[in-house]
């Protein structure tokens, strides 16, 4: 919502990004702000960045058309140039997220506890799904490479954590995105990420009051929200729900404070 409709950070209005790389930069700023104002982890989905790939594609295409005006360059050649430049921008955008997350400090004096969700099934159409696959591929490739420490040695960064969803389009040889699963497995063998979620089991286990199953990311690295249907819209809601983190309740204190009154006990609880 903040990427699509704009947001305010430190009193400055940030409008909807006009390129993929800008969207990645703003996403890291949002991550840092949220991490500084809550306990517990948070998660973002690469699906929310996918629409900005096409925004950049159209922007780059317009630039290429202007550059090639009057030249005898085929449409196919122009498309190749556009896609090459687009891949380069996606590379820079993903790198921005990786390095910003591990170098930004929250008000707690630590890096944001962030998980990146990679789920092809969230895409709204075929083009967005293909663009999302490019982002996922670049994210996994960069994590496989790692980041350099102060000695210049490639190491595994602690954050962001990665979660990859296994689904019908990527789980078996011959499926359209099986190459991503192979790449993810190769990365896990070296870097111990990504973790994996089964879409099939999530749809069976996370069923809302409408009887519909849902596949979604956890908060941070392990805690899953319970299914929730927004009473105003009648639709399930998982993104944008505040993560309060782990809470300890002193039942003895609550009992003493209630003075033996059961109604007051549950009200305090």
PLM region descriptions:
Residues 1-269:
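Conserved catalytic cores of very large enzyme subunits
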